[in-house]
């Protein structure tokens, strides 16, 4: 068999003429080699993905799937808060710190990795409070859109206190606006916040550039906390729609950043909508479908819906639709009330007065079920998915001795809950529901 002759001549480079031999450029050949990371198996597998890892629709799909699946696999880790009384408000500061406010008027930060508690000094009014003053505690903590300022209650529960983030240095106190306790706060821009009070009014506060720069300058000169005092920019009373004006107390606020609209819930069972930009202008007031114990409100931007908690229902309101179109869902927690509510993706998380967390799927229009039967309160597969708070701490005071000593464990109302930025950690806090009982609960579900 004759062997075919094979030419060992190198192919001429493009552009070389006939009979010309191109030089072999070894340095150019080396420069064209793929970088090591592109030769890896990881790079090869990532190149085969159906969607790029930074594709927004793909990420939204993943977040939605996680939001629906995660509640069924969450496990609880309790924190010990000492003798603090009832955690009413909370917000994540970063991936490991949560700031909280209590009924005993304590502002503190808890490290969810170590459990360490750090108390933050609360800010005082221009004039000292009278000796007869009685505090209701800190009911609201809110962070502005750029996460540079935090607003909460002051030493006087009628006043709003603003801190700088991430240092929690004091910036200013807004005093002289309300005659009664502040129940809720909402930021309507990076420098403007609205407070809602038990006196039936809403106050608009502005942290001007002058206030912020002055605060920076004073902190640079003094080792003692120094802060400004500001007055409200606008003050509006909610409409007295009911026959009992005493119940016209602003209980909760939620802001729609897209339409610049502020929703407010009052204890007389009404929902109020305001245009909130440089001032507050009323748009509408409507009677709620369930008007007992309306103490919590949240806005879902993606769904253009307000969620309002009541004694046993969560009602979903779309201000663009007639009031009779509002949909309500029964939470099977008759008598204890809905104490906190929030949106994450298509899941509405509901905290109850009986220490339960429920999860409502807006798309499926039903509560999530326990698909495994492994949750603490589930007896059978397919039961309603319900997470129950731990024992917490309870002071066996005179109230407990007289009325509750025969009860082994008093459930802790979920007064506040919040997801971290990843949506994989849920901070839950509260305390005993009866007014005279003193106790606390805080836990991380992850």
Swiss-Prot record:
GO molecular function: ubiquitin-like ligase-substrate adaptor activity
Pathway(s) annotated for this protein in UniProt: Protein modification; protein ubiquitination
Localisation per UniProt entry: Cytoplasm; Cytoplasm, Cytoskeleton, Microtubule organizing center, Centrosome; Nucleus
A Pfam entry, by short name: Beta-prop_DCAF12
Keyword Cytoplasm: yes
PROSITE patterns: WD_REPEATS_1 (PS00678), WD_REPEATS_2 (PS50082), WD_REPEATS_REGION (PS50294)
Keyword vocabulary terms for this entry: Cytoplasm, Cytoskeleton, Nucleus, Repeat, Ubl conjugation pathway, WD repeat
SMART domains according to UniProt: WD40
Repeat positions for WD: 132-173, 177-215, 245-284, 333-370
Region (Disordered) residue spans: 1-33
Gene3D superfamilies listed in its UniProt record: YVTN repeat-like/Quinoprotein amine dehydrogenase (2.130.10.10)
GO biological process, one term: protein ubiquitination
UniProt feature, compositional bias: Basic residues: 1-12
SUPFAM superfamilies recorded: WD40 repeat-like
Assigned GO CC terms: centrosome; Cul4-RING E3 ubiquitin ligase complex; cytoplasm; nucleus
Quaternary organization: Component of the DCX(DCAF12) E3 ubiquitin ligase complex, at least composed of cul4 (cul4a or cul4b), ddb1, dcaf12 and rbx1.
Family statement: Belongs to the WD repeat DCAF12 family.
Function, in words: Substrate-recognition component of a DCX (DDB1-CUL4-X-box) E3 ubiquitin-protein ligase complex of the DesCEND (destruction via C-end degrons) pathway, which recognizes a C-degron located at the extreme C terminus of target proteins, leading to their ubiquitination and degradation. The C-degron recognized by the DesCEND pathway is usually a motif of less than ten residues and can be present in full-length proteins, truncated proteins or proteolytically cleaved forms.
Protein name per UniProt: DDB1- and CUL4-associated factor 12
Gene: dcaf12
């Amino acid at each position: 068999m004759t062997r075919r002759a094979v030419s060992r001549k190198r192919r001429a480079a493009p552009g070389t003429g006939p009979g010309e031999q191109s030089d072999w450029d070894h340095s150019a050949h080396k420069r064209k080699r793929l970088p090591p990371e592109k030769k890896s198996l990881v790079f090869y597998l990532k190149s085969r993905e159906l969607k790029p890892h930074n594709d927004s629709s793909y990420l939204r799909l993943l977040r939605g799937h996680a939001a629906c699946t995660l509640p069924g696999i969450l496990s609880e880790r309790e924190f010990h808060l000492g003798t603090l009384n009832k955690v009413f408000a909370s917000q994540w500061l970063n991936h490991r710190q949560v700031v909280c406010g209590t009924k005993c008027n304590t502002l503190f930060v808890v490290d969810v990795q170590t459990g360490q508690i750090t108390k933050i000094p609360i800010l005082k009014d221009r004039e000292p409070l009278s000796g007869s003053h009685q505090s209701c505690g800190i009911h609201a903590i809110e962070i502005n859109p750029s996460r540079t300022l935090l607003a909460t209650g002051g030493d006087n529960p009628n006043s709003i206190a603003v801190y700088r983030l991430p240092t929690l240095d004091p910036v200013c106190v807004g005093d002289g606006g309300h005659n009664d306790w502040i129940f809720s706060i909402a930021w309507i821009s990076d420098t403007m916040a609205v407070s809602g009070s038990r006196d039936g009014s809403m106050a608009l506060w502005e942290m001007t550039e002058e206030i912020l720069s002055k605060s920076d300058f004073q902190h640079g000169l003094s080792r003692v906390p120094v802060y400004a005092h500001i007055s409200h920019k606008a003050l509006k009373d909610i409409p007295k729609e009911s026959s009992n004006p005493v119940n016209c107390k602003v209980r909760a606020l939620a802001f729609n950043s897209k339409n610049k609209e502020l929703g407010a819930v009052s204890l007389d069972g009404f929902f109020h909508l305001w245009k909130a930009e440089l001032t507050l202008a009323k748009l509408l007031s409507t009677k709620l479908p369930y008007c007992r114990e309306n103490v919590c409100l949240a806005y879902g931007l993606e769904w253009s819906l307000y969620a309002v908690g009541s004694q046993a229902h969560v009602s979903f309101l779309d201000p663009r639709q007639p009031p009779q179109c509002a949909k309500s869902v029964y939470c099977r927690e008759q008598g204890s009330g809905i104490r906190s509510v929030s949106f994450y993706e298509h899941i509405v998380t509901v905290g109850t007065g009986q220490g339960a967390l429920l999860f409502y799927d807006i798309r499926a229009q039903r509560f999530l079920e326990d698909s495994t039967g492994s949750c603490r309160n589930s007896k059978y597969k397919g039961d309603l998915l319900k997470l129950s708070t731990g024992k917490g701490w309870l002071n066996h005071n005179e109230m407990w001795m007289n009325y509750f000593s025969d009860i082994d464990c008093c459930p802790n109302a979920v007064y506040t809950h919040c997801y971290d930025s990843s949506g994989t950690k849920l901070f839950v806090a509260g305390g005993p529901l009866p007014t005279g009982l003193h106790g606390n609960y805080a836990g991380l579900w992850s």
